[in-house]
């Protein structure tokens, strides 16, 4: 199962989807023109994937973010500890890494409807 899915990922800030729910910001989702509450986030999806017996695929925002953000997300999800983002995950109650093996780079980035879309040449 992919998280987050679809056009939504092109404006997704994963940091908004972790930590105490009361502290998560609500943001405008430009892809679907709705409010994203971030009340079901990355860690909740990881929990759900395990309960469902499915393998999690993490999608990386390539629409409005880039490689540095992808590195931070990887560190949060897969590093054991001793780094800023892996220790942040631990402080959120997840001592062990999510160990995500499947990663999706953006979503339909060649489509002109996509935030941050690129042509094949670009």
Feature roles, as predicted:
Residues 61, 114-118:
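Short, solvent-exposed loop/turn segments at secondary-structure boundaries
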Residues 1-9, 60-81:
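Carboxylate/His-rich catalytic cores and anion/metal-binding grooves
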Residues 41-44, 65-72, 122:
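Extracytoplasmic/secreted proteins, especially bacterial periplasmic and envelope-associated proteins
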Residues 55:
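Residue-level detector of anion-binding/catalytic polar loops
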């Amino acid at each position: 199962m992919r998280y987050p899915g679809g056009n939504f990922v092109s404006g997704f800030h994963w940091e908004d989807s972790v930590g105490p729910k009361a502290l998560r910001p609500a943001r405008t989702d430009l892809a679907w023109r709705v409010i994203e509450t971030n009340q079901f986030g990355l860690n909740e999806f990881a929990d759900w994937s395990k309960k469902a017996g499915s393998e999690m695929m993490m999608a990386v925002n390539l629409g409005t973010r880039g490689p540095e953000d992808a590195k931070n997300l990887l560190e949060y999800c897969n590093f054991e500890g001793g780094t800023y983002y892996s220790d942040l995950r631990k402080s959120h109650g997840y001592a062990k890494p999510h160990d995500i093996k499947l990663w999706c780079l953006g979503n339909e980035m060649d489509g002109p409807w996509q935030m941050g879309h690129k042509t094949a040449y670009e």
